[in-house]
Amino acid sequence: MKVYFVFLCLLPSLISGASILPEPRKDVRASASNAEIQSLAEQFYAADTNKAASGDITLNLQYKASSTQTSSGTDFASQKLFNYVNEAKLFARPTFARLVDLLDNYVHTTGTAESVPTAEVNEQNAFIDEIFKTSIITKLSDFFISKGYYSSAASFKTDLKEMWFGLYTRTSGPLDSSGFEHVFHGEIHKGKISGLHNWVRLYLLEKSGQVNYLSYSSDGVWNGYPDIYAFQLKWSTYLKTLGSFFIGSSPEFDIAMYTLCYVTRPDSLCSVKMGGSIFQIQTYTWANSTYGNGKRYVASSYPNI
């Protein structure tokens, strides 16, 4: 009799095609306020012990382009952007060293499948392991756990690797891209530079003669590092009309700032703060493919100046 009664109760759902499974648990995450995000960004700024000191980087900005000049592709700078970078000091630091290891792993032209052999997977893991030793990533992890975004540091670590290093296609063809490749390495997509928002990569490209610095269009208000700039440049013959960068920051700082905004303010402008000055980071999710339970990969993230 009880079985018959239960069946009658469920019959309307079965007829209508509705699921009889329990509804998924509702999102229990506490919303992160703008004030909390800005406060945490300030903590990252104060805790970035691996950042460049004032004498570790010397820039030669040369010409400031107007808004009408940035898209012209004109070379207003006769000299290189980076006069000096203290590689012996900065690149010997573990998180920098692990980042540099990753930067030769990618085919920069979209449309070509990315091969990820075991050695490169090991380099990804080594980079993530290293940044998780820093106080910046610890602060980020603790914040996410306190807000219910993740249940543990281990679950956050697993998800961070997937959101940044998981492969997807930007060309409706082979798996040719990832959030990390786009933001930290840079790509050539549809005849233009796409992504490329990491200063270490920019420096190494210019040092090797692959990038030609053209001009700058924005200089942040900060006197020390990290600072924020917007540049115009060419990678081979391909143009970047406006590329924004943290300059002098550590790899863990960049990852933390971008991930904080990506998780809490996806596909939008995210207000953060450094040294008392507010600015915004733009994040984009990759909507054409997902991983896990409908999660989206990083498409892009950069300072919006």
From Swiss-Prot:
Enzyme class label: lyase
Cell compartments where the protein resides: Secreted
E.C. no: 4.6.1.-
Segments forming domain EndoU: 33-305
Signal sequence annotation: 1-17
Chemical reaction(s) catalysed: ribonucleotidyl-uridine-RNA = a 5'-end dephospho-uridine-RNA + a 3'-end 2',3'-cyclophospho-ribonucleotide-RNA
Subunit structure: Monomer.
Protein family (similarity comment): Belongs to the ENDOU family.
Cited function: Endoribonuclease that cleaves single-stranded RNAs at 5' of uridylates and releases a product with a 2',3'-cyclic phosphate at the 3'-end.
Name of the molecule in the record: Uridylate-specific endoribonuclease D
